[in-house]
Design a protein with these regions (language model features):
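Acidic-leaning, charged glycine-interspersed low-complexity segments
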Residues: 90-141
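Conserved acidic
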Residues: 5, 9, 80, 125
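Small/polar-rich, solvent-exposed N-terminal microdomains that initiate assembly or binding
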Residues: 1-57, 95, 99-102, 106, ...
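Mid-chain, well-packed structural core segment of small domains
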Residues: 74-97
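Oligomerization/assembly interface segments of phage tail-like spikes and tubes
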Residues: 61-75, 127-138
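Short glycine/proline-enriched loop/turn "hinge" motifs that connect secondary-structure elements
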Residues: 57-62, 122-123
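A structural signal for the main folded, soluble domain(s) of proteins
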Residues: 29, 56, 79, 127-130
């Protein structure tokens, strides 16, 4: 088991989302890998939690990453947040799969989404959609 591709996978997903024109039209440059301070206004995309398990086989060391990408907004209703969630999904499913600096992304699957109303740190209501993905990576530099 290896976590060797953890940083490379996050960097590739971040680059794909940050460079996607359709997503940029909806959120500008608001794609983050850390929660912005306070409760930022508007809508943003956040790379979030990740769980990893061994997925090595006879041909390569590998891992299965289960990761969450969130859409957070202070806008009324879920419609705008859902449009952003669709753009995230479209960006990640567009071929080719994102290239990794180390190893290879074998597959990336959407698993589920959960939309919720929450209270921000200032007490204001925010909406959040958590998109869950499963990624299979292999470390082709290690046999």
């Amino acid at each position: 088991m290896s976590y060797a591709q953890g940083e490379a996978l996050q960097a590739a997903i971040y680059a794909r989302l940050a460079g996607d024109p359709a997503l940029a039209a909806l959120v500008g440059g608001a794609v983050h890998d850390a929660v912005p301070p306070g409760t930022p206004p508007g809508t943003f995309v956040l790379l979030g939690e990740e769980r990893v398990r061994d997925a090595s086989d006879g041909t390569a060391a590998g891992a299965e990453h289960r990761l969450t990408i969130s859409v957070v907004t202070d806008a009324a209703g879920f419609r705008g947040a859902k449009a952003v969630a669709v753009a995230v999904g479209d960006a990640l499913s567009a071929p080719p799969l994102p290239a990794l600096a180390r190893g290879r992304l074998v597959a990336l699957w959407f698993e589920r989404a959960e939309a919720r109303r929450l209270r921000g740190s200032d007490g204001a209501e925010v909406r959040r959609i958590d998109l869950s993905y499963r990624a299979r990576v292999e470390d082709v530099s290690v046999g």
